[in-house]
Amino acid sequence: MVSRQEQFEQVQAVKKSINTASEEVKNQALLAMADHLVAATEEILAANALDMAAAKGKISDVMLDRLYLDADRIEAMARGIREVVALPDPIGEVLETSQLENGLVITKKRVAMGVIGIIYESRPNVTSDAAALTLKSGNAVVLRSGKDAYQTTHAIVTALKKGLETTTIHPNVIQLVEDTSRESSYAMMKAKGYLDLLIPRGGAGLINAVVENAIVPVIETGTGIVHVYVDKDADEDKALSIINNAKTSRPSVCNAMEILLVHENKAASILPRLDQMLVAERKEAGLEPIQFRLDSKASQFVSGQAAETQDFDTEFLDYVLAVKVVSSLEEAVAHIESHSTHHSDAIVTENAEAAAYFTDQVDSAAVYVNASTRFTDGGQFGLGCEMGISTQKLHARGPMGLKELTSYKYVVAGDGQIRE
């Protein structure tokens, strides 16, 4: 096993091969990575079977689905890499140019960060997404996967590096930390001088640990306590469709709805319909029904477990939905501000003034009017695959694509000027 220190030194030694690579060279490397990923399908599936067997009974079925790979999912990962090829190269982009009275010409240019560290949990697709995005944005990457997905991740990284071996980019620009202990995560948090940026992707425990302990600059990809508010002027059919998609299409992801707020004027009509759709109809279809966590007012209209205080501060990542009835738009916004992780929140309303108030007052990375929160995604936003959803305001916010993985520098051109 290569030590963490050796890996940090290896990636530092070769980072220039990617930091200054041309768009053509990077695109050739990405295509080679995608091809080798598909070619290694058999090896990756064998590794994934080991991870799945070890995880069964230890994590929920929803989380097992995040870990699971088949040939179609591997092909989708490769397709995601190829889609990055089609994205414009951000490196070298001129952001601003100005000329001073003394004749100096100042140009602000986009440049690579350098080396980016990614700490993430049991999501194999993050491995290929992170490698593709960092490479296209001119960065080397150090990956630290969760223990549950390590065998799968190792097989994926092996395939990606074999792809790089056929190009002029050194394969060591992608590093996988082999030690999955907590100490390896803390070592990355303290790797100042080796990592230029650290991005955690996972649950609240991981993200909080990184934010609280890292001395390396961090972009916080926050948890998703995502709200949908059904206003008194909502179209109920539209609301039900949005709720169904936001909660059930993929409950294990961070843009899935966790909290439903319903105006009291709508509760008596929409909540029984919601119960029919999310419980009765799903049972009839052989699907897992939604489990409700209900406040006292919501429990008057549907059956379910009484909500506890912490339910409105929980990212369930499962077929569980907390429901609260509110008396006004203002109460809904106040609730969101008290419980939000500033990820994605939505209002369903036909009232333009209510929509404007909601979008002005709710301080989240993505705020929706009459649309599912499941659109908070790099691909859906036209950014290609993403590095995560940033819930902070400094440097990057919302889905992080290529540009969010870059910095800039000033190039100052003169003709012998000196400062008086």
Swiss-Prot record:
Family statement: Belongs to the gamma-glutamyl phosphate reductase family.
A Pfam family reported for this protein in Swiss-Prot or TrEMBL: Aldedh
Cellular component, GO, one term: cytoplasm
GO terms, biological process: L-proline biosynthetic process
HAMAP family: ProA
Domain of life assignment: Bacteria
The protein's enzyme class: oxidoreductase
InterPro entries with a match to the protein in the record: Ald_DH/histidinol_DH, Ald_DH_C, Ald_DH_N, Aldehyde_DH_dom, G-glutamylP_reductase_CS, Glu-5-SA_DH, GPR_dom
Catalytic activity: L-glutamate 5-semialdehyde + phosphate + NADP(+) = L-glutamyl 5-phosphate + NADPH + H(+)
Protein name as it appears in the record: Gamma-glutamyl phosphate reductase
Subcellular localization(s) per the UniProt record: Cytoplasm
Role, per record: Catalyzes the NADPH-dependent reduction of L-glutamate 5-phosphate into L-glutamate 5-semialdehyde and phosphate. The product spontaneously undergoes cyclization to form 1-pyrroline-5-carboxylate.
